[in-house]
A protein has these predicted regions:
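Glycine-rich phosphate/pyrophosphate-binding loops
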Residues: 166, 171-172, 177-197, 525
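Bacterial N-terminal signal peptides
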Residues: 15-26
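Glycine-rich anion/phosphate-binding loops
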Residues: 158-166
Length: 534
């Protein structure tokens, strides 16, 4: 399989310029329109989940390409994920002006003619993958949470890192307007880029807490716990196995903040406990928090702050996924706990659920881990669907939307070797021994993987080797590929109407997901700037 390097198509780039004023007119609610029926948002994000990885997991779990829980949702689209860094790099090469929110050329961010108007999956079909530059999770999640493009590394903050550059998130605005409950759930630290972008603001995604490496500003954890105070927070970052001595140069939460959380008048804390079933604890904790009139905080995770990653087994005809430690809840259990809590709010709710370990697995080119992580996401989506289907409450498909997408793609996976993998099949996977040089920074969330992923020129050296060539990973970093969007329930049409407005085909921009949600929730069009407190 031949990999074609990125190139710029001048003719296409000149063809589509997006002017913000027009976009605002398009999405403005009509005068006199009745209040939207949408009250509940369940927003799933598979971090680093490309279309190729979805197909790979579906083949393993179901023996076909379209068996995942969301692949048959009525609303289907593709999403461009570029950020300001990607845009400006492409603009320089094309000798075009840098990004401006008031006027920009969408096709400078993602070149449809070179890379296609849909994700490419399969052997001969995968002839071009935009390996980089690519967005990072912080700027990608900011686009989803605020509707603003920004720089890599920014958490709901304007590009260029101006003072007072905070951007109001859709979760904050929805809570302010209606009293809705808001929550974030993740398998990675609760203040990592994707969940943090919906409930905090900082020009640096690495400012995990005040005092970290001498950081004097308001850290992400501090802002989440002490200022924004989401109704539900469930994620990793527990110091028990990650930073038990509270070394101020590492970890995700300071000692003072952790002790304050344990004694908090606002939150009921459910935390990882040796020998305890984390899933049972968080579900019971949700009920206890409701009874006590408190918010719910679930603090879990293992070494590195993440939930212990699951693994898929090579078991032809009988797929089998082994979960991580039971001391952490599964993503499905955490999702149910969050929904049980938020569903009691008569003002509605907005829940963001991230499967963050897909990204880690793809950074490591770990096919087995990737498949297992997507299997866990499938379980969580099914649990959420069952919650909405459950009779006897006010949450149903007439007032609830469930969407599944990715913040970006990672790993450049290519399917289509001599052998097509089927139900329960995994490729032979061996760790590489030697790494001749370090990889360049190409949008990777963490640069080198723990296994020492490396790039050589011109051949990429994956941290895992697939000697039978059933599959190929093209990078340890992020890519600028289109990712999938699947939507079901109330307000599906709001998302679908944006397809083809900025890009040909069924493509919409990640900021347009935010626009669709704003319109469906009755929040109105996004102005030039939506800074906090203004």
């Amino acid at each position: 399989m031949k990999r074609i390097r990125p190139k710029t198509n001048q003719a296409l780039l000149g063809g589509l310029t997006v002017v913000l004023l027009c976009a605002v007119i398009v999405v403005s609610p009509a005068c006199g329109r009745r209040a939207p029926a949408l009250k509940h948002v369940i927003f799933f994000i598979g971090d680093g989940m490309s279309a190729q990885t979805e197909v790979a997991a579906s083949r393993y779990l179901y023996g076909r390409d379209d068996g995942l829980a969301w692949q048959k949702f009525p609303g289907q689209a593709y999403v461009a994920t570029w950020d300001v860094n990607v845009y400006n790099g492409n603009a320089r090469r094309a000798r075009r002006p840098p990004y401006s929110r008031s006027s920009f050329t969408a096709l400078l961010g993602y070149d449809v003619r070179t890379y296609g108007s849909k994700p490419r999956v399969g052997g001969d079909d995968v002839v071009a993958i935009p390996f980089g530059p690519a967005t990072d999770s912080a700027s990608a999640a900011t686009a989803l949470a605020t509707g603003f493009k920004t720089d890599s590394g920014n958490i709901s903050w304007l590009p260029g890192d101006p003072p007072a550059g905070e951007l109001t998130t859709i979760t904050e605005e929805y809570r302010t307007k209606t009293g809705a409950g808001i929550g974030v759930v993740s398998t990675v630290p609760f203040n990592h880029a994707t969940p943090a972008a919906f409930v905090s603001h900082n020009p640096s995604r690495n400012a995990y807490y005040s005092g970290l490496k001498g950081y004097k500003g308001l850290g992400l954890a501090d802002e989440i716990i002490l200022r924004v105070k989401p109704d539900v927070v469930i994620g990793g970052g527990h110091p028990l196995l990650d930073n038990p001595d509270f070394n101020p140069r590492q970890g995700y939460i300071s000692k003072s903040l952790y002790l304050g959380l344990k004694a908090s008048p606002d939150y009921l804390l459910v935390e990882r406990t040796p020998g305890a079933d984390g899933g049972r604890a968080i579900v019971e904790g949700a009920a206890a928090a409701l009874r006590a009139g408190k918010k719910l905080f679930g603090l879990f995770g293992g070494k590195g702050g993440n939930f212990d990653i699951a693994q898929a087994e090579d078991s032809p005809g009988r797929p089998r996924v082994t979960s991580g430690s039971e001391e952490n809840p599964s993503l499905g259990e955490a999702t149910v706990a969050a929904l049980d809590y938020l569903g009691a709010n008569p003002g509605g709710f907005f829940l963001v659920v991230e499967q963050g370990d897909i990204d880690w697995a793809n950074h490591d080119n770990d096919y087995r881990g990737m498949v297992a992580c997507i299997a866990e996401l499938v379980g969580a989506v099914r649990a959420a669907t069952a919650f909405v289907d459950r009779p006897g409450d006010t949450v149903d498909w007439t007032n609830t939307v469930l969407l599944v997408t990715a913040d970006h793609a990672t790993g450049g996976l290519v399917l289509g070797g001599a052998k097509r993998l089927g139900l329960g099949d995994l490729p032979r996977q061996d760790p590489r021994v030697a790494y001749p040089e370090a990889p360049p920074a190409t949008g990777s969330d963490r640069g080198l993987s723990p296994n020492g992923a490396a790039l050589t020129t011109p051949v990429y050296a994956s941290p895992n080797v697939y000697p039978d060539e059933d599959i190929i990973f093209g990078t340890a970093g992020h890519t600028n590929e289109l990712v999938d969007l699947a939507v079901t329930g109330a307000a599906t049409r709001y998302f679908m109407k944006y397809r083809g407005t900025w890009y040909p085909g069924l493509v919409l921009d990640n900021t347009q997901i935010n626009s669709a949600l704003r319109e469906a929730l009755g929040l109105g069009a996004l102005g030039r700037r939506a800074a906090r407190g203004t």
